[in-house]
Swiss-Prot record:
It is an enzyme of class 3 (hydrolase). Mg(2+) binds at S234, T255. It is found in: Cytoplasm. Homodimer. Heterotetramer of two MnmE and two MnmG subunits. Keywords: Cytoplasm, GTP-binding, Hydrolase, Magnesium, Metal-binding, Nucleotide-binding, Potassium, tRNA processing. The keyword Metal-binding applies. GTP binds at residues 230-235, 249-255, 274-277. Belongs to the TRAFAC class TrmE-Era-EngA-EngB-Septin-like GTPase superfamily. TrmE GTPase family. It comes from Gluconacetobacter diazotrophicus (strain ATCC 49037 / DSM 5601 / CCUG 37298 / CIP 103539 / LMG 7603 / PAl5). Binds 1 potassium ion per subunit. This is tRNA modification GTPase MnmE. The gene is mnmE. It comes from the Bacteria. Exhibits a very high intrinsic GTPase hydrolysis rate. Involved in the addition of a carboxymethylaminomethyl (cmnm) group at the wobble position (U34) of certain tRNAs, forming tRNA-cmnm(5)s(2)U34.
Length: 435
């Protein structure tokens, strides 16, 4: 039997001490295996309490566990194949015993993402929806959960499928213009086709011009804290993280390398980066820390510029959030464009957290419609829009048709309809085993 059709199994629940472990099973012959393991198949999609037995020809049957068994006959299953779930007691010996019994019956352990890959192969979902499921598993916040669930439910796929259907119709009209140039076609057909192509390309461009908000929400933002030595950057990192993540010292230049901490601000995952103090130095190690600090400033989604006097550090982006620390020693002057805080006393920290949360939400909030969520999607749509732009510039009907066909192919790769074999290992390799 080809390996892609063999029955596979895997734990769908995490490792460690627990009451229940869920074992999933799918593939050709799954029903026969289940009957040898627990007797007659239970009614489809209904939980039944069954004894699970290891049956060897040379020995008496051995009871492995009493478990809830669910049977999902294909194609109405997650993978589209005959599938089952075994809700076991989660003891390591129980799990190992059932796994050994399944191997003896002809199943093999699943690879990461193999259940979802089979669902894709059987048309149960497309590549965009599969990636949405992966994002749903990884979601850390409510905002990420909503975005991932929309994608897994097909919200993005419906947009892209709609584009593909429109482009397919326009390509048919273009082929008619090529094949029947002397026929009495309705007047204005070619201009209407060009107008529709222009409108379709404009929709794609509007989808691309979203500021990368969906991608930023999916991966999380990066906020970099910068400032001169000893202004309280490490103390601020610790305060925002709620723990002592960075060493705090009165000695200037204590922080040499960047320190990264993951927090949630405004329901958005944010990586806070504490950097070396910005100053001229002859110390090679500290100078390297300063160079890395400037690198993180350049690549940050938001810069938190920290100071304890009236001078903001140089080379800071105009949209940086300016924070003046140690207001317990010198208050912020009236009208100053800075949030005044005292990390040591906690003064102003609520206002700063609010400002950071608002910035995080502003950087990830989608203005209208579901956003792009991956660089792969962006590249495919950019390629599609590029071919449409080339088609609009073509005066030869045959060349215009060829550009439209290339656009169809690029759009098909987006959802996995065409030419994505080289992508599948990358996409499904990101899943956990059991999904």
């Amino acid at each position: 039997m080809p390996t892609e059709q063999m029955p596979i199994f895997a734990l769908a629940t995490g490792a460690g001490r627990a009451a229940i472990a869920v074992m999933r099973l799918t593939g050709a012959g799954c029903g026969d295996m289940l009957q040898r393991l627990c007797g007659p198949l239970p009614p489809p999609r209904q939980a039944s309490l069954r004894g699970l037995w290891r049956r060897d020809a040379a020995a008496a049957p051995v009871l492995l566990d009493r478990a809830l068994v669910l049977w999902f006959p294909g194609p109405r299953s997650y993978t589209g194949e005959d599938s089952a779930e075994l809700h076991l007691h989660a003891g390591p010996a129980v799990i190992a015993g059932v796994a050994d019994a399944l191997v003896a019956l002809g199943a093999r352990p699943a690879e990461p993402g193999e259940f979802t890959r089979r669902a894709f192969a059987h048309g149960r979902l497309d590549l965009i929806e599969a990636e949405g499921i992966a994002d749903l598993i990884d979601a850390e916040t409510e905002a990420q959960r909503r975005q991932a669930l929309d994608q897994a439910d097909g919200t993005l796929s419906r947009i892209y499928d709609g584009w593909a259907a429109r482009l397919r119709t326009l390509l048919a009209h273009q082929e008619a213009l090529i094949d029947f140039p002397d026929e009495d076609l309705p007047p204005g057909v070619e201009q209407a086709l060009l107008d529709d192509l222009t409108a379709l390309r404009s929709e794609m461009q509007a989808h691309l011009d979203d500021g990368g908000r969906g991608e930023k929400l999916r991966r999380g933002l990066v906020f970099t804290i910068v400032g001169a030595p000893n202004v309280g950057k490490s103390s601020l990192l610790n305060a925002l993280a709620g723990r002592d993540a960075a060493i705090v010292s009165a000695i200037a230049g204590t922080t040499r390398d960047a320190i990264e901490i993951r927090v949630v601000l405004g329901d958005v995952p944010v990586t806070l980066i504490d950097t070396a103090g910005l100053r001229e130095t002859q110390d090679e190690i500290e100078a390297e820390g300063v160079r890395r600090a400037l690198f993180h400033v350049k690549h940050a989604d938001c810069v938190i510029a920290m100071f304890d006097g009236e001078t903001v550090p140089d080379d800071i982006p105009a949209d940086a959030i300016r924070v003046r620390n140690k207001v317990d020693l010198a208050p912020v002057p009236a009208g100053a464009d800075a949030i005044g805080i005292s990390v040591r006393q906690g003064t102003g920290m609520d206002a700063l957290r609010t400002a950071l949360a608002e910035r995080a939400r502003a950087l990830t909030a989608s203005a209208a419609g579901p956003p792009l969520t991956r660089a792969r999607h962006r590249a495919a749509i950019e390629e599609t829009a590029g071919h449409l732009a080339a088609a609009l510039d073509m005066h030869w009907p045959e060349m215009r048709g060829e550009e439209m066909r290339l656009a169809m192919r690029a759009l098909g790769r987006l959802t996995g309809a065409v030419g994505v074999e080289d992508l599948l290992d990358t996409v499904f390799g990101q899943f956990c085993i059991g999904k």
